[in-house]
Curated annotation (Swiss-Prot):
It comes from Patiria pectinifera. Its main location: mitochondrion. InterPro entries: NADH4_N, NADH_Q_OxRdtase_chainM/4, NADH_UbQ_OxRdtase, ND/Mrp_TM. The lineage of its organism: Eukaryota, Metazoa, Echinodermata, Eleutherozoa, Asterozoa. This is NADH-ubiquinone oxidoreductase chain 4. It is found in: Mitochondrion membrane. GO terms for cellular component: mitochondrial membrane.
Length: 460
């Protein structure tokens, strides 16, 4: 674990040392090295609850897949950004790469931290680099408004989380997660106090995911962010909220959790349905993919709030699968944007006549996004569906409709980008190249691994 943290930190430092002509090759090679090192975490993934232990860091079956996902997608996001960022001067290029590696280091620290204070610091460290990526390298003037939305939503959610951590320390006299699980003093406190803690602790995570009702910052941030920002935001940063819920919900197995989880689950299911309907009315391709992320994260949150092992396993599986697929969708949307200069669905159409191989990638990613077998999305959604129906049979029609509308908008993306007639006023469309196909391929390789071995990310 320490080797992984040190490697990412040293890579961040070397970004400012290497010669200009070696900047991108060395950064990509270093990020690939981090990915290879992270794969070693799978060796003892299922042998014990905590492993790779040090004083403040450890991994377990919950954090290991998310660390590997973070490390895997950073080199892909760098390769996807080369065409855009190479037009800037070398200082801006070094700054951009440094911000990406800062986010990676903060993510590894967040997912491996045993202390709640270190978890909070690393959790909030991702804010500033992401904010800079959006405001500095966004495509349009609206990026400043998107940055303000992102900043204030995150800050509003962060303060209650900090108060919760301080309160936990004052009662438990420790903020180390294994120690809190052992003492379990919170369960003996009054239900009013634990209910307030429950709400304060989880509001930061449901904003970060986000679920419907706390999501207004996400479409703006996605639409205005550069491709690396969109890929990292969709694939990894949204999973911080889900990881926070998975980490802290065992601390609150109290009467308050049994009291507050049912309305939270119902709200998440309803939000998933509403968001799926909103997706059908979008005219911007990136906004549509962003709203689909809100819908998927609402389903993930409903699985976690169900407080069942099936729901938690389904949530973790869907988080990993959605991270890969949403990143691939944003990457494909960027490939079309680089060729026609717009994200409007009425213009971004008919590309199967110009780039037929991209149609294959669109088909695979959209099919995976709607959850057809044998994709991991189906496994996650089925596990959550079973957990929700077991929780309350009356919720079955709502979550089923949300899933059906999710399939409809996934097919809408595929149909509008490929099957319509190609606009006559567009000309000189560049053909795709090998590096672009390689990007999508490396998004799909982990999906094949999960199809062949889904138990790799399931918890006991």
């Amino acid at each position: 674990m320490i080797y992984l943290i040190l490697t990412s930190t040293l890579t961040l430092a070397t970004t400012w040392i290497v010669p200009r002509n070696l900047l991108w090759p060395s950064s990509i090679l270093n990020s690939i090295l981090i990915s290879v090192i992270s794969l070693n975490l799978l060796n003892n993934h299922s042998t014990s609850l905590w492993h790779n232990l040090s004083l403040n860091f450890a991994t377990d079956p919950t954090s290991t897949p998310l660390i590997i996902l973070s490390s895997w997608l950073v080199p892909i996001s760098l390769i996807a950004s080369i065409n855009t960022i190479q037009n800037h001067n070398h200082i801006n290029q070094r700054t951009f790469i440094s911000l990406v590696f800062t986010i990676l280091t903060a993510l590894i620290l967040t997912f491996s931290s045993l202390e709640l204070s270190l978890f909070y610091i690393a959790f909030e460290t991702t804010l500033l680099p992401t904010l800079t990526l959006i405001s500095r390298w966004g495509a349009q003037k609206e990026r400043y408004q998107a940055s303000i939305y992102f900043l204030f939503y995150t800050l509003i959610g962060s303060l209650p989380l900090l108060v919760s951590i301080i309160a936990i320390f004052s009662y438990e006299n420790t903020i180390i997660l294994p120690s809190i699980h052992l003492t379990n003093y919170i369960t003996s406190l009054p239900i009013t106090l634990t209910s307030i803690w429950w709400i304060f602790c989880f509001i930061a995570f449901i904003i970060k995911m986000p679920i419907y009702g706390f999501h207004l910052w996400l479409p703006k941030a996605h639409v205005e962010a550069p491709i690396a920002g969109s890929m990292i935001l969709a694939a990894i940063l949204l999973k911080l909220g889900g990881y926070g819920l998975l980490r802290t919900i065992p601390l609150f197995y109290t009467p308050s959790s049994l009291l507050l989880s049912p309305p939270a689950t119902a709200f998440c299911i309803w939000g998933a349905l509403i968001t799926s309907i909103i997706c059908l009315r979008q005219t911007d391709l990136k906004a549509l993919i962003a709203y689909s992320s809100v819908g998927h994260m609402s389903i993930v949150a409903s699985g976690i709030f169900s407080l069942s092992l099936w729901g938690i396993n389904g949530a973790l599986t869907l988080m990993i699968a959605h991270g890969l697929i949403s990143s691939a969708l944003f990457c494909l949307a960027n490939l079309l944007y680089e060729r026609n200069g717009t994200r409007t669905l009425s213009i971004t159409r008919g590309f199967k006549m110009v780039t037929p191989l991209l149609t294959l990638w669109w088909t695979i990613t959209c099919v995976a996004n709607l959850g057809l077998p044998p994709t991991p999305n189906l496994i996650g959604e089925l596990l959550i569906l079973v957990a929700i129906i077991d929780w309350n049979t009356l919720s079955a029609p709502i979550i089923t409709m949300a899933t059906v509308f999710g399939a409809i908008y996934s097919l809408l993306i595929l149909s509008s980008t490929n099957n319509s007639s190609f606009p006559q006023f567009l000309s000189n469309i560049q053909p795709t190249n090998t590096s672009e196909h390689t990007l999508i391929t490396f998004h799909l390789i982990p999906l094949v691994f999960l199809i062949l071995n889904p138990s790799a990310i399931l918890i006991g």
